[in-house]
Every structure is written in structure tokens, then in C-alpha cells.
Amino acid sequence: MINFSNTLVILNNDVPCELLKKKYSELLIPTISILDFKKKKIYKKYNNIFLYSYQNYSFLLDLNDNILLKIQKYLNKNGILDINLYLNDKNNNNNSGTNKKDHSKIEDISQILKKLRKECLYNGYINISTEQTTSENGIVINIKAENPDFNKSDDDNNLVSSDEEIYEKCEDKKKVVNRVCDNCTCGKKEKAMNLEKIKINDNEVEYSTENVVSSCGNCYLGDAFRCGSCPYKGLPAFQPGENVKLNLNVC
């Protein structure tokens, strides 16, 4: 049994569809014409969208004004599109009694089903099913297709639940800059400036960088890459653990 609680009905502007429109209106189910649906913007998504048309189905194959693609935008994930086409049985008359005409009729209907199935497939629908039944005045074609939920994991995982997830990838770790504050009170700046100064003579001073800590990774590269508050400002580029000698006579 179909749940009509979140359903939109799209109908063509013809007499049989007008009768359907009245029935759906009595059930308080929203309806809209195919022409209005193409022109207007819908501000809601639906679990089910029904489309009815009598005789005409060419608009479903129009690539310049793709109604199947627009319908998909207003379907919820895993929502169902239900297309119902009523086609006149031109071969079902008093003069038609040959097997050849009946066979031609079946081929025409199968080609229509094949084309519409392809269009649904090309527009990204999945679980497409087709069915044809014979009515009093012709043939009824029914096509059901589902709007896929391929992006479910992306939509659900946009929010970060813990700090560890921020640093999950190595690339992200490289982008994180954790600088020392100028007015540091937590001891991080003091730890970062833990350079062992060894005076060789009056002209030279040597710094041991064995215990050097660089939060941003730029401290080792030289003044051109260091921030204004870098504790190693003035020292040449060095490798961690390397002893750095400064000539005090050079201005």
C-alpha cells in the first residue's frame, strides 16, 4: 500500500488527468501540471512523485528541458518516481483482427518502454521497473524508478565529532599551525627557547639545537620562513640536533 503522506502528483493538461486531479485533491494530495512544474521552483522534497500523462510522452524524452532530471532534484534519497502513461490502442478497432497488427502494437509499446527506461537510467535513477497492462481504451505503461542515495556517507560525515578526526590524515597534520603566543604563560615558549648556549671565545658562540621544539615546522628554515615571534629569530637555518655557530664580529 502506497503512503501518500509525502507525495506530489504531476499531471498533463488533458481530460482524463483532470479527473485524476480531482480525486487526488479530495485526498488532500498536492497536484501540479507538467507545464507549471517545468516553470516553477518547488521548495520541498518528496518521498513519492507520481507523473500521469494521456497519449503524450514525448516531453519525457526532451533533452533540452529534462523533466526527469528536475523531478530527481525534488525527490528524497531513495524516493520513488512513478510514471503512468495512458496510450490509445489504435490497432484495437473493428477492422483490426490480424496477428500482424497485434504484433506491431506490442513492438511499439516495447520500444516506448525501452526508451523511457534508458532515459531514467541516463538521469541516474536505479531499480527501474516497467510494466504494461491493457485497459478498456488502450495500453497503460507504468515505470517506477528510485532516486539513489550514493552520497549518504558524504552528507552524514560532514561534521567532525572529535579532535582526533581533524588530524586523521597526514596531509591535514602538515597544514595545522600551532604557534607559540607572544605572551605565553603555559611554559611552551620557554620550552621552545631551550637552546644550550656555549661560548667558544669572544668572537664565536655555539648553540646546541638538540632540544629545539618547532610547532610550525618553519623554525629550522631560516628567518625568511619564521614568524615575527619566533624564538629562533636571528639564527641561520639549521637541522634539529645540529650545533649552530655564530660569528659575533659579523654585523
From Swiss-Prot:
Q: Which InterPro entries match?
A: Anamorsin (IPR007785), CIAPIN1 (IPR046408)
Q: Which GO terms describe its cellular component?
A: mitochondrial intermembrane space
Pfam families per record: CIAPIN1
Q: Where is this motif: Cx2C motif 1?
A: 216-219
- State the source organism's domain of life: Eukaryota
Q: Which organism is it from?
A: Plasmodium yoelii yoelii
The record describes the protein's role as: Component of the cytosolic iron-sulfur (Fe-S) protein assembly (CIA) machinery. Required for the maturation of extramitochondrial Fe-S proteins. Part of an electron transfer chain functioning in an early step of cytosolic Fe-S biogenesis, facilitating the de novo assembly of a [4Fe-4S] cluster on the cytosolic Fe-S scaffold complex. Electrons are transferred from NADPH via a FAD- and FMN-containing diflavin oxidoreductase.
Q: What do we know about how this protein assembles, alone or with others?
A: Monomer.
Q: Which UniProt keywords apply?
A: 2Fe-2S, 4Fe-4S, Cytoplasm, Iron, Iron-sulfur, Metal-binding, Mitochondrion
Q: What is its main location?
A: cytoplasm
Region N-terminal SAM-like domain: start-end pairs: 1-154
Motif Cx2C motif 2 positions after renumbering to this chain: 227-230
* This protein's record includes keyword Mitochondrion: yes
A GO BP term here is: iron-sulfur cluster assembly
Q: What is this protein called?
A: Anamorsin homolog
Where are the residues of the annotated region Linker? 155-167
Subcellular location per the Swiss-Prot or TrEMBL entry: Cytoplasm; Mitochondrion intermembrane space
Family affiliation: Belongs to the anamorsin family.
User: Could you tell me which residues belong to the region Fe-S binding site A?
Assistant: 170-186
One GO molecular-function entry: 4 iron, 4 sulfur cluster binding
Q: Where does [4Fe-4S] cluster bind?
A: C216, C219, C227, C230
Residues the record lists as binding [2Fe-2S] cluster: C170, C181, C184, C186
Quoted from the entry, the domain comment is: The C-terminal domain binds 2 Fe-S clusters but is otherwise mostly in an intrinsically disordered conformation.
Which portions of the sequence form the region Fe-S binding site B?
A: 216-230
Kindly list the cofactors needed: [2Fe-2S] cluster; [4Fe-4S] cluster
